[in-house]
Amino acid sequence: MSNVTVCVRFRPLSHKERKTNGDKVCFKRLDSESFVFKDEREEDVIFSFDRVFYEDAEQSDVYNFLAVPIVADAISGINGTIITYGQTGAGKTYSMEGPSILHCNKQKTGLVQRVVDELFQSLQSSESMAMWSVKLSMVEIYLEKVRDLLDLSKDNLQIKESKTQGIYISGATEVSIQNSSDALECLSEGIANRAVGETQMNLASSRSHCLYIFSVQQGSTSDERVRGGKIILVDLAGSEKVEKTGAEGRVLDEAKTINKSLSVLGNVVNALTTGKPNHVPYRDSKLTRILQDALGGNSRAALLCCCSPSASNAPESLSTVRFGTRTKLIKTTPKSISPEVDSIKKPIPDSHGQNDLRDRILNKLRLSLKEEDVDLLEELFVQEGIIFDPNYSVADIDSACQDAASQEVSLLTQAVEELKETVEELTDENERLRGELELAQEAAAAAAAARADGALLGFVPAVAISSLLRPFGFVPD
């Protein structure tokens, strides 16, 4: 068991904060792990964390303490998650991405760029791993829908769970990346697609929770082992007070959804730290469902609580550090996860074992499929040279097949939902056109009646009548 690593970062005072409150701050520095903060009753409270980063801390300080151990574990096959949390405008996205994902000096680069560099440096320098691969996915949770930032046509992805993968986002685009440059270009594309908006507290406020997902897989030179790890970086949207942000309209709706999901996150943390693990409301929001493994499963986790140092934001900063204090009590059980069976296609000397496993799989499939379908699959296995590792059981491969089927069903479900929306739009358009047609028919009937009475030409020019009725297929003689 291990605790979630929790750090607090105070950003420098902004120009607006200095103009309003001068250099007054809401905390008193003690050391690298503790500070004093006044609560609602103006009483001094000492808060302690794994590390406190004050205004003069560098981006590299945050990365070296918070992220380096998680990257090392991911390369060793243990999943890791890093979450930035805090009030809107507190520096979460700056800590995660820096001022720009592509164009900023080395000193200011954020956690994302540094994780990418560390991953490829470690993998390329490893002598024990003969082969490796890194895949990148990037999604956002916007208005409680999971959207693929690398393929905007996928705007309602489903969250699934399996024995081999744990919690995963079904159908999310996975891009194979070969080096840091490829990764940053891909990340830049995803960031450009992210939902942002302007508020009184932040000119480029994130309106969604963003997840950067790096999947690492390696094969050993000494044996046939293949191990995989995953790093998930989570840039949460900030909690907001409407009276401070001035949100209205759609921005207000976004704020309500953001605050609700963060409230559920707080409920999950409370449930995990108050001795009621059987009643953890992971499914109450998309965010907590995705973070289920990080907070209560087999992943190593770290939390960076970002705070404004200004006295004007003291209530929000106090709420943030209290959330960090509760999160620090969570215990997880990090362990290595085997990669998906269907991703392992490497030569294995024991052909007898391969054939035996293939036959057992086909026999199992015969229980649920037609005989002719199984025969076609057998031909496909032989023609395509699909290899089965005898080290994996039928149950393992069956689980992997079920995962693949679940992903396909998710994509089909999404397509059906999109078709339903299209049908609804066409139905509305059809009703509108039907109404216009009825009006045109009434106008044509009235015109015919007026003409019969010899009164039409006395008050409406014939040209005007022709122009009015021509779009509907009625042209007066």
UniProtKB/Swiss-Prot annotation:
GO molecular function: ATP binding; ATP hydrolysis activity; microtubule binding; plus-end-directed microtubule motor activity
GO annotations of cellular component type: cytoplasm; kinesin complex; microtubule
GO term, biological process aspect, one: microtubule-based movement
Record-annotated Kinesin motor domain positions: 3-330
Residues reported in the UniProt entry to bind ATP: G86, Q87, T88, G89, A90, G91, K92, T93
Pfam family, one: Kinesin
Recorded coiled-coil stretches: 402-451
Entry's localization field: Cytoplasm
Family matches, as InterPro entries: Kinesin-like_fam, Kinesin_motor_CS, Kinesin_motor_dom, Kinesin_motor_dom_sf, P-loop_NTPase
Reported impact of R289H: Diminished microtubule-stimulated ATPase activity, abnormal chromosome congression and segregation and reduced spikelet fertility caused jointly by reduced pollen viability and defective anther dehiscence
Keywords, in A-Z order: ATP-binding, Coiled coil, Cytoplasm, Microtubule, Motor protein, Nucleotide-binding
Alphabetical list of PROSITE patterns matching this protein: KINESIN_MOTOR_1 (PS00411), KINESIN_MOTOR_2 (PS50067)
Tissue specificity field: Widely expressed. Expressed in young roots and leaves, in mature roots, culm, sheath and leaves, and in panicles at various developmental stages. Strongest expression is detected in panicles. In the panicle, expression is detected in anthers, glumme, lemma and palea. In the spikelet, expression is detected in both microsporocyte and the anther walls.
Function: Kinesin-like motor protein that exhibits microtubule-stimulated ATPase activity. Plays an essential role in male meiotic chromosomal dynamics, male gametogenesis and anther dehiscence. May play a minor and nonessential role in regulating meiotic spindle formation.
PANTHER family: CENTROMERE PROTEIN E (PTHR47968), KINESIN-LIKE PROTEIN (PTHR47968:SF17)
Family label: Belongs to the TRAFAC class myosin-kinesin ATPase superfamily. Kinesin family. KIN-1 subfamily.
Name under which the protein is recorded: Kinesin-like protein KIN-1
Originating gene: KIN1
